[in-house]
Amino acid sequence: NSNLLLYGYGSYGNSMWPSFSSTRLSLINRDIIWATAHIRGGMERGMKWWKEGKLLNKKNTFQDYISCAKFLIDKKYTSKKKIIGMGGSAGGLLMGAVVNEKPDLFLGMIMAVPFVDSLTTNLDHSLPLTIGEFDEFGNAKENKEHFEYIYSYAPYNNIKKMDYPNILITTSLSDNRVLFDEPLKFTAKLRDNKTDNNLLLLKTEMNAGHGGKSGRDGIIEEI
């Protein structure tokens, strides 16, 4: 029953292989377990694993992550009062969808530059990256089935009047992949709807992009 941070991504066929990072030492030194969920949408188990977590199969990504969290709790690695979810960008979409579905499963969520207004972005073909996302998420503007499916899980559209865990959301003013208005809108709507007294924090980096600050000094400052 240790404190545990469960990282997840699950999109674009990107595999989250186990690796060492010195940025996690502060967690390890405080006896916090770092776990990485190999969920569908990634390609840890081949092309089929990716295809089963994209387009009209996207919800498999969210259910896999929830299953990983429940497994870690059932096996006594951690508990509901000690597990925190973490994901960034498309992993932030994952966190947003999961926290709307299972808010009582986590002590908290960390959502970095999260893709949380995914339906609005998908509908706006003038944005530079939208059309390139069709193969991953679908085309909601021209396909009714895609529209209804994305709407059914898009984090912004599925915020409810209920208790949420502690949530930290980060965004960057110069992010050209997930525009800063997405996390801001999500935070504002969440603040208006949540019925708990848990923390809801938004941090905006004024001189950073999608990957955070640039240069050695900027990276160290963020850490």
Spans of model-derived segments:
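Alpha-helical transmission elements in cytosolic ATPase-linked domains
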Residues: 7, 19-22, 101, 185
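Short beta-strand segments enriched for Tyr within beta-sheet-rich domains
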Residues: 2, 32, 105-107
